[in-house]
Structures are given as C-alpha cells and as structure tokens.
C-alpha cells in the first residue's frame, strides 16, 4: 500500500505520527512524507532561505531513517490559505504520490498552517480522482478517494485545552527509538522551540505527549488518529488492517 503523510512543516510528521509511519514502513508499505512548507520561519538566527535549506535536508534525513521518501510542496510558513490555487497544488501532490491512505493534520490545532493544511488535504482527497479537476504537474487522476486520517493536535487538546479524544490509538512502544531518531534529525529546531515555544527539550516533550495519548488506551506510548468517514470518503478501517489488531486500540 502507498502511504502519504502530508502535514504543514518539517518535524510535524515525526512528532505526531513518526511511530505509526515506522510501523507501516517496517511492514513493507511505501511511505512518502510531504511537508507543505520547508519551515522557513523556524529560526531566530537564520534567514528564511537558509533555514529552509537546512530543514529540507533534516526532513529528508528523518524520512530516510524509516526508508520513507520526502519532498516539500513549497508553500511558505504562515501563508497557507484555503484558496483555489492552494487546493489545486495539494491535489497535485496526491496525484503525484497516488496514495491509498493519507494522514494529515488535525482540523483543530494551535497553528493556522496545521488547520489550513488539514482542510486542503481533505478537499484534495475528494478532488484528486475527478478527471475534470485540473491540477499542476500533469499526473493522472487517482482511481479513487483515499482513506483519510487526521493526526492528533498538539498536546492532544482542543483550543480550550480539553482532551481531543482520538478514534483509535496506535501502540508505538516498540518503535519509540525510531520516533526519537526521526525527531532528533531536526536538530535546527532545538533552539527555535526553546526560544519561541518555551520547550526546553523537544524529545522529552514528544515522549510526554506520546505517553499522554497512550493513556487513552492503557499503553505506554501511543499516537492518536481520527478516521474521516464523511460521505463519500472510504469508511473501512484500513489503518487497522495494515497494522494489525495487536497494534491498534479503538476507543
């Protein structure tokens, strides 16, 4: 199966879904990680072009840890908007990668880029199989709407700090070393997250968030997802089928 993880920035895939991607890759599935932006605002010390170049390399190294491919859709930080051009560009990403299963950002999250990405990806999943919908790149329409899953928001909470309870939790305890390694590849973000987010150690924070999600399902570490099942999106439990019942706790 072909898996596409399309989130806003470099390090988002690793933070929210790195363990799940490691499990899927280990089972032989083809994993592609795409970021909407190269993270060009993620520094107080480098220019936008400098930090973007650094972060593209970091994202590629992180993806390679689990044998995944990486590329950037080349939007810019804090400039992802739900308009016609953006929707067509995201549709082009889906047609280029032809995924069976798509994971994207939570539609409710702390960052405007996360929320806009989530809605654009949802729309692109619908549009990608429509032959009369033009998108750049020249790739053929998809054969069908892919399965769509939303990753958890930051800290697993909504805007009012209430728990955002997922539909299912993936047991990632066996691949926490991979998740740590993937996130550690984003070395440039240690200082940024400390200075801008007040996050002293982003690896420890990731472990705390993963443990918090795991508690929903009595697991040591987990990653939560919501399956988008509105008409006409696929409703069969593909993620559970790919990972196996032992790795999934449905809530």
Label the predicted regions:
Residues 1-4, 82-251:
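Metal-dependent de-N-acetylase/amidase catalytic core
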Residues 1-97, 127, 238-244:
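Active-site rim/loop-helix segments in enzyme catalytic domains that contact anionic ligands
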């Amino acid at each position: 199966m072909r898996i596409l993880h399309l989130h806003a920035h470099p390090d988002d895939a690793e933070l929210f879904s790195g363990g799940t991607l490691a499990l899927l890759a280990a089972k032989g599935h083809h994993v592609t990680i795409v970021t909407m932006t190269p993270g060009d605002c993620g520094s107080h010390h480098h220019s936008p072009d400098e930090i973007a170049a650094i972060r593209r390399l970091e994202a590629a190294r992180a993806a390679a840890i689990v044998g995944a491919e990486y590329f950037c859709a080349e939007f810019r930080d804090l400039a992802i908007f739900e308009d016609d051009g953006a929707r067509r560009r995201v549709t082009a990403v889906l047609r280029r990668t032809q995924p069976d299963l798509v994971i994207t950002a939570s539609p409710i999250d702390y960052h405007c880029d996360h929320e806009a990405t989530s809605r654009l990806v949802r729309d692109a999943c619908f549009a990608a199989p429509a032959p009369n919908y033009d998108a750049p790149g020249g790739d053929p329409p998809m054969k069908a709407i892919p399965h769509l899953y939303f990753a958890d928001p930051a800290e697993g909470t909504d805007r009012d700090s209430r728990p955002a309870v997922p539909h299912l939790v993936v047991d990632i305890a066996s691949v926490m070393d991979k998740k740590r390694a993937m996130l550690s590849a984003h070395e440039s973000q240690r200082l940024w997250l400390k200075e801008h987010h007040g996050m002293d150690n982003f690896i420890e924070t990731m472990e705390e968030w993963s443990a918090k999600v795991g508690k929903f399902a009595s697991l040591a570490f987990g990653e939560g997802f919501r399956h988008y099942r509105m008409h006409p999106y696929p409703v069969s439990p593909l993620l559970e089928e790919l990972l196996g019942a032992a790795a999934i706790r449905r809530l």
